[in-house]
Design a protein with these regions (language model features):
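Hydrophobic helical membrane-anchoring modules
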Residues: 1-6, 147, 171-239
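Hydrophobic alpha-helical segments typical of transmembrane helices
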Residues: 76-77, 102, 133, 137, ...
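Residues that recognize and position ribonucleotide moieties
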Residues: 82, 131, 158, 175-176
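Short, flexible, basic/aromatic active-site loop/helix in glycosyltransferases
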Residues: 111-153, 158-166, 217-221
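Short, hinge-like loop/turn segments at secondary-structure boundaries
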Residues: 81-82, 108, 134-138, 207-210
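Structured catalytic core of nucleotide-sugar glycosyltransferases
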Residues: 1-129, 163, 167, 184-192, ...
Length: 239
């Protein structure tokens, strides 16, 4: 029986049958570097393809969570974090564009600088021009309005402590604003450069025009929430 995990790797996925085996293999290699009990939580966001379920290993347990329908990245991420048992949560995409080997460096920064969240910054993005340009504009507008001190909130690769992970609210679009939500709740955040690889298999699930409209509406909602959210955090209970 696997001991209680120190790390929970949460990966939402939708129709990534061609990537799951390689993904688990890469996460396995990363967890061996960390040398602590861990779990991988793969959250199936209503996939319609037929995917194989890679086995776990003595070093980690794989937990499969299935959503009743395709609910979006925020929902899959939220449910994965709520079910996480580790003291640290590692978030990443299933498309293999994130390099799991960046996670140990991010965790080292998290602990050495006493942060609660470290988010990746894709310095050399392997995306087309339209996606890179729209992302730069979105990051600039979001940063100016929310003052979240985050260069690349769209990078899924993040590491955070369990407490702020569990406090994240469940709403569509939440995944775009994790640094802002964590910061506005009174936690400390940081960022560091990470690899961004070309997609090997499958197709992107991001829709252009509709995504921009949703993101704008979500930004307005997030602006309201960041001003109304509780700012304090419970430090300790005294008798």
């Amino acid at each position: 029986m696997n001991p209680d995990p120190v790390y929970s790797v949460v990966v939402p996925f939708y129709n990534e049958a061609d990537n799951l085996v390689a993904l688990v293999r890469e996460i396995d290699a990363m967890l061996r570097v960390l040398e602590q009990p861990a779990e991988i939580i793969l959250v199936n966001d209503g996939s319609t393809d037929k995917f194989a379920r890679p086995p776990g290993s003595p070093a980690f347990r794989i937990r499969w969570l299935d959503l009743s329908r395709n609910s979006g990245q925020s929902a899959a991420m939220y449910h994965g974090m709520q079910q996480a048992r580790g003291r640290f949560v590692i978030l990443m995409d299933a498309d293999l564009q994130n390099d799991p080997m960046d996670a140990p460096k991010m965790l080292n920064k998290l602990e050495s600088e006493q942060l609660d969240l470290v988010t990746g910054v894709r310095t050399k993005r392997n995306d087309n021009f339209v996606r890179r340009a729209s992302s730069r504009v979105a990051n600039a507008v979001r940063g100016a309005l929310l003052q979240d001190h985050t260069s690349d909130t769209g990078c899924t690769l993040k590491v955070l402590r369990a407490e702020p992970a569990k406090r994240l609210p469940g709403w569509n679009g939440m995944h775009r604003f994790i640094p802002a939500l964590v910061l506005s709740a009174g936690y400390k955040i940081g960022e560091m450069p990470v690899e961004h690889r070309a997609r090997r298999s499958g197709v992107s699930k991001v829709a252009g025009g509709k995504r921009a409209v949703r993101a704008t509406i979500d930004l307005l909602g997030m602006l309201w929430l960041s001003r109304r959210q509780f700012k304090g955090r419970l430090l300790a209970e005294e008798d």
